Amino acid sequence: MKTNDKTKKIVLTAGTFDLLHPGHHNTLKYAKSLGDELIVVIARDETVKKIKGRKPVIPENQRREMIEAIKPVDKAILGSLTDKLEPILKIKPDIIVLGPDQITFDAENLKNELKKLGLDVEIVKTKEYTNCDFHSSYDIIKEIVKRWCNKKIIKK
């Protein structure tokens, strides 16, 4: 998927992107600022269920569609159900941006894995965005539960 134009810098980031919040947007803006083209890999529903123990609230195709509609994003694709490295190996990005809560990849291990496969990719880890009340999906869910459900079930 890498273009023949050696001057075009491709940036890739990945995530669940369930219940969009300003932290997601901040990560996407930052990722886009590092290159010319931003491609976002959306975690599959089944992958999220395996990792987090629950399916996302928003189905994968809707999450992909919403992310692709956000201004900094040039393209959004669904991840692989079988190999987390598959989209990276297809796209061959120059830079991979890992969000602050990225648990699928460790920056150093990912860089080493890709190097063994012949890809020299810069890995950047973003810091948590805390400039607003609802900077994570968990914060949004907590607020919904607080407003709409029995307040006793919320643990701080």
From Swiss-Prot:
GO terms for molecular function: ATP binding; FMN adenylyltransferase activity. It catalyses: FMN + ATP + H(+) = FAD + diphosphate. Its EC number is 2.7.7.2. It holds the Pfam family CTP_transf_like. It is an enzyme of class 2 (transferase). Keywords: ATP-binding, FAD, Flavoprotein, FMN, Nucleotide-binding, Nucleotidyltransferase, Transferase. Homodimer. The lineage of its organism: Archaea, Methanobacteriati, Methanobacteriota, Methanomada group, Methanococci. Transmembrane segments: none annotated. GO terms for biological process: FAD biosynthetic process; FMN metabolic process. ATP binds at residues 16-17, 21-24, 101, 129. Its cofactor is a divalent metal cation. Catalyzes the transfer of the AMP portion of ATP to flavin mononucleotide (FMN) to produce flavin adenine dinucleotide (FAD) coenzyme. This is FAD synthase. It comes from Methanococcus aeolicus (strain ATCC BAA-1280 / DSM 17508 / OCM 812 / Nankai-3). Pathway: Cofactor biosynthesis; FAD biosynthesis; FAD from FMN: step 1/1.
